[in-house]
């Protein structure tokens, strides 16, 4: 009995002496990963991470039985079958640590350690311990896993363990999961203490939210059982770096759970959330190697996306350390104790007796602290205890004191405050002592602010304080009045604060400036413009234009000329026509009445025949005969016309016969009061010319017959209001044959634009001709047939016009046909060839439009040249072209202007060109073109334009037969309105140019055309037959233009174009015999869609820098060509030579160029389908680059230099490559074309300087080869084309003339055979350009269009059949 009592006493003494220590674990030496399960990557949740920790036990501080605990946050479990580890040194166990895995129960794992008897007071042991662990990165929707899912992120992390109040840590890099976070997420891990697995599945991501879905998993066999009592369902708003939910919220769903299946259905999950489920599952004893889970993932997203992604995944088996607990249930309980720490323990369990294993989580009683306050002098602390399961409360009551304040006045200079604390009571006393107050003085004064304010200035005790009231200055009312004195004066009346001051300005009367100008009315008027003080009043006297008297007189020269003598207002202008002394006959009949005058004139006809025989061996004869019959129009004007034909000598003889017949009827009425003219005109004419040329010699004979005929039928009606125009035209014609003629006409009434202009240039018949028809001006057609084909035309036009308002509905048609017969032989045995050429052309243009416009032409005065040209064209098939023009004056202070206009097929467009030149200091010109309806400038006057044209060409023989049968039908209605555009120029140089316009154009146009062209050519090497037909329709619904500072934007809503083509080509050469080609007609239309394009220009000037930038991009898709097959060879050689000479300073391409010009052009790659001359299908890719370099200046006049480099590459491809973009080269066929040009132009000129222009040769070569195309059964034997071109231009510029000589030689050869089938549509990306100048000019452009066409199945079938047939 005594022994038992002693043992109990020893036990209780030992318990009483044991204590809790800390700081045993001293360092975190390392944390490394070892892949122990063939995991895809080393994630923190995968086994095994090995932590190496340093420990130390000091016998003087620790005793056997003492305890210490290591807490490891975010550690999920220990990867070992051991339950504890010993801290051993030299084979001695100094402490034993037991593992407590957190798993799904706590957010941390821990080790509870007990010091063993091996430690004595004279021992200090230390060492390291290795712990195999895995971390918890989440995996279910429980609060423990949700909290631990936020412990770490991918990348560098700090892992910290705690031993009491001592912390040890290390850094580690955790890699991110490679699995996609947007797809189905599935996860499972073993819970060793429960001998179960937790299984998780997250639905695939729907960014816009889920409309509905089904999610779950099931067992494929009986190898696994689902614990339906542990299921969890939620939605999460995010996944961490390892695809684990970081939150869990409830939502509406329906669940179905059985031991073999766990499925939920859900609806209306908001965007940003994803459904997920988890549950415990238990592996059966038979599933030793693993088990399968079948995942269900069906979802319908809010944005219409749908998915059904089933998955079967095999999970390998995992064996835990509690293998002997088969059939026993595990219960997790929580017990609250009065200890201060949380612990996990497993109650004793005997599997042979007990049926339940109990894991007990021991938690301390929670405590909350409440702090209160009260009026008192001491602090109190009270504790409200609680039983286990409750919460204890600690109340801390903190005292505070109240205060009472006593204020008194004293003799000191400062304020003092003293606080007296009462140790026995809760009321303290504050004593405040303030000095006695000073007297105050108030003053009022003005200040610069806008509101009144008050400022107080205090001084020390026994002093005087000041109050300053600051008022804002009074408002001022200023009045200005005239007075009788000659000088200005100002009087100011001021008032006190809060009043109003007055300023009276007295000005003398303004001076007056009187100007006199012409106007369109028939009477004189005076207008007075007054301005305010210090201005200048204006008196404008407007006088009608002077009457003009025209006289004609003969003179001794052989050419005609016109002289105009103008006088000031109220005078009479004179026009003197000087004619050479020639034979003429005319008859004039005049009938007059009270209201109209009619006249008729019969022009005489004459013929001249001349023959000339030279002393050379070759004899040539010239016979010339012509007759004309031109009835004069019946119009309210007396007219006289004459025609003279003179003989001339020629180096080669020729015979020309021509007859001209025309009739012209005109009806018009005039009302002077309303200034309205209306007319209805009909004009028809026919011309037939026959010319024969022959030249006989001892060895060859050649005869040529040319027949040309045309007929014109036009109708138009005009309404003209407020017209006052005068035109004076003089023309001089000279040629090498020494024939000279002149024509002069003066007409006080000029008809308005008819908007249908028919013009033709028959330069092949007339070697040199100028045709400029216009309803606004007299028509002049000059032509000469000369064996040397050289002519000179000089004309002078003076124009003065006011506003025009017209409405017209013209209709016109034009028919022409021509034929050419030629027989030639060079020797009695040479070959003979016949050529027959005929053509016909008909045009019907029916536009209707309404136009209001006004224009004024400015004065040419010293230093500045300002010219404006206005024209309007409303015909789809019309073309208006004018040659280069230049103005010249004898006055040294007046400089020149060059201008060139070429307008073709414009619809509803008003165009004008404004040129400003400053020539006295070499600043160059600023040229701009813009749509406009009116131009106003500071000064207006007549403009004289002189044009000269010199052309030299060598006619070449041609052997061809061409038939052209076009038919064009168009209709158009449009209306336009626009504001005025103003141009402002100031100072002695062009400092600023302000351009502003707003225009709106609406139209409803439609145009259709039907064109048929066939051509036959016979030559010694073969014959070519070609034919084509074209049908097109176009419509433009609406177009709007808005412009500010020369900024333009326009849009075309729709454009449709359809075409058909039929081309048959046969080529026979001496080098290779070819077979006849057959081309299949493709009737499917092309569709083009245009997107809006924009154009903007911005001007800014600092008198030295001009910059311009142009960017453009367009996209066009074109249809493939039809299938063709050819075997061909082509050889071409041509030589061209031209010479041009322009008068002084009339060089249109150089004069208006700014100083120091730099232009950069870059063309991106392009691809398109097109037919070669051999009718093969070729898809090409091209890129070009041209870079003109900055010019260099050698004097203060003008210097211009340009360098250009170009490169082009073409790629040929088959039908499988239906889209080609920039920098792509198509396969399987290759085609290469290179164009290189490096011309350099340098021009420098002043009063006496000259410059030479040299350009290197330009060479272009094309080399194409076509291989076999895949998937289309194409055959190809290769196609090679070579084109070479060389240019050796030479230009010489003098101060008085510019001469340019151009020589060009072209050699081309094509040979080979090919067969190609239909290719698919491609995309063309065309040209991006950037330019910069050394003066202020910026231009941008952007646009795009696309087209798509697919070949018909019929064409594909026919092409395959044709391929096998050939």
UniProtKB/Swiss-Prot annotation:
Sections of the chain in a coiled coil = none
Q: Spell out the InterPro entries in the cross-references.
A: Adhesion_dom_sf (IPR008966), Agglutinin-like_ALS_rpt (IPR008440), Agglutinin-like_N (IPR024672), Agglutinin-like_N_N2 (IPR043063), ALS (IPR033504), Fibrogen-bd_dom1 (IPR011252)
Glycosylation site list:
294, 596, 866, 1273
Which residues are connected by disulfide bridges in this protein? 74-151, 97-113, 206-301, 228-257
Q: Where are the ALS repeats?
A: 368-399, 404-435, 441-472, 477-508, 513-544, 549-580
Q: Where in the cell is it found?
A: Cell membrane; Secreted, Cell wall
Q: Name one Pfam family in it.
A: Candida_ALS_N
Coarse class of the primary localization is membrane
Q: Spans of biased composition, class Polar residues?
A: 959-969, 1022-1040, 1085-1107, 1192-1202, 1209-1218
Positions of region (Disordered):
449-470, 583-658, 758-780, 804-833, 874-915, 928-976, 996-1040, 1081-1130, 1158-1218
Domain characteristics, as noted in the entry: Each ALS protein has a similar three-domain structure, including a N-ter domain of 433-436 amino acids that is 55-90 percent identical across the family and which mediates adherence to various materials; a central domain of variable numbers of tandemly repeated copies of a 36 amino acid motif; and a C-ter domain that is relatively variable in length and sequence across the family.
Q: Which family does it belong to?
A: Belongs to the ALS family.
Name of protein: Agglutinin-like protein 6
Organism the protein comes from: Candida albicans (strain SC5314 / ATCC MYA-2876) (Yeast)
